[in-house]
Regions:
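Substrate-binding N-lobe of the ribokinase-like
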Residues: 2-3, 11-79, 85-86, 270
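A short, flexible beta-alpha/helix-coil linker loop
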Residues: 10-13, 148, 219-220, 242
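Residues at secondary-structure transition points
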Residues: 20-24, 50, 76, 151, ...
């Protein structure tokens, strides 16, 4: 299976411990896919600053192909700053600077590379909703809508929901009725599977309205950064054995079971100290 993770890369900076880690939805997904044995590629714009070199090093050391990423001269990497206490993060600020690389612009060259994928994973954090027509490619397409309400409006759904096989959302704990209501506008737009991760409350998956629910295997988490990204990979690994656009409740149930511990306590990559 060849996976291409399409979109963002950042540096996650832990202000109170002065540690930094490569991150971003697409970077995390690519690394976790490689660790599961997939042929993994990251496709996104890279800067040429020291932070970009940290991201590149982490991806390459984890076996992720970055050979098709455009490197933008004189551009910088976004830094997301957090405080982390007892494994739980609290957001502080985003530092983009005046020369941030910005979203990837898909050209014919990138499109040709995307055609080689069995699975494409992207997210709202890629900041490229107008380019999500890449869903028309033969690959299975998964999209992470994150946790913010601005990515759950009818207008946003209309822009990005072209042919999504799996939609992922980070949510507060909810019951099945509330989850069904959350899924309805996505299913109406042709999304086959909708996965909600709810932290310690577990996960729910809707397969064209049929809901599968799983609890969480509790562990002592050392770090929750990237937990949702790692959670989706077991499901996708199973689902990719199924034809694009087809419902498969068994694949979803198996994937959710695998998710119970996969995303907890997973620290992507340590790079030492970062002084800002």
């Amino acid at each position: 299976m060849k996976l291409i993770a399409l979109g963002d890369n950042v540096i996650d900076y832990y202000h109170n411990t002065q540690e930094c880690f490569p991150g971003g939805n697409a970077v995390n997904v690519a690394v976790h896919a490689a660790r599961l044995g997939a042929q993994a590629e990251y496709l996104g714009s890279l800067g040429d600053d020291n932070m970009a070199h940290i991201v590149e090093k982490a991806l390459q050391e984890n076996g992720v192909d970055i050979s098709h990423c455009p490197v933008l001269q004189g551009r910088t990497t976004k830094v997301c700053s957090y405080d982390v206490v007892n494994g739980e993060r609290s957001f502080l600020e985003v530092i983009t600077g005046e020369s941030w690389t910005g979203p990837l612009q898909i050209t014919a060259q990138e499109l040709d590379e995307l055609k080689t994928a069995d699975l494409i994973v992207s997210s709202c954090n890629a900041k490229m909703p107008e380019q999500m027509a890449v869903q028309a490619l033969p690959a299975v397409f998964a999209y992470d809508f994150g946790e913010k309400e601005k990515y759950r409006t009818d207008a946003y759904y209309d822009e990005v929901c072209h042919s999504i096989d799996l939609a992922m959302l980070s949510c507060k704990p909810m019951d099945k009725a509330a989850f069904a209501e959350l899924c309805a506008p996505l299913h109406r737009r042709g999304v086959v599977h909708v996965l909600a991760t709810m932290g310690a409350a577990g996960q729910m998956l809707s397969v064209q309205g049929k809901i599968v629910e799983k609890t969480t295997q509790m562990v002592e988490a050392s770090d929750t950064m990237g937990a949702g990204d790692s959670c989706c990979l077991p499901l996708l690994a199973v689902y990719c054995g199924v034809a694009k656009g087809k419902a498969h409740a068994g694949a979803g149930a198996s994937g959710c079971t695998g998710c119970r511990a996969a995303g907890l306590g997973t620290q992507l990559y340590g790079t030492g100290r970062l002084w800002l």
